[in-house]
Amino acid sequence: MASSTDVRPKITLACEVCKHRNYITKKNRRNDPDRLELKKFCPNCGKHQAHRETR
C-alpha cells in the first residue's frame, strides 16, 4: 500500500485555462516540494497551456 509520505506520489495536472484534469504523473517530493507546473497540450483548448498540480 502507498503511504501518505510516499517519495514519488501520483499527481494530477489540470489546465490553468479550462480547469480540465488532463494528465496523471508522478513527481519526486524531495526535488519538487511545491506544486508542479508544466506546459502541456490541452485537448479541450486545442493548444499548449500551463498545467498545474491539483490536490
UniProtKB/Swiss-Prot annotation:
Keyword Ribonucleoprotein attributed: yes
Cellular component GO terms, alphabetical: cytoplasm; ribonucleoprotein complex; ribosome
A Gene Ontology molecular function term of the record: structural constituent of ribosome
Pfam family, one: Ribosomal_L33
Keywords for this protein: Ribonucleoprotein, Ribosomal protein
Domain of life: Bacteria
Signal peptide limits: none
Entries under PROSITE patterns matching the protein: RIBOSOMAL_L33
Entry's Gene Ontology BP terms: translation
NCBIfam families: PRK00504.1, PRK00595.1, rpmG_bact
HAMAP family for the chain: Ribosomal_bL33
Family assignment from sequence similarity: Belongs to the bacterial ribosomal protein bL33 family.
Protein name: Large ribosomal subunit protein bL33A
Gene, per the UniProt record: rpmG1
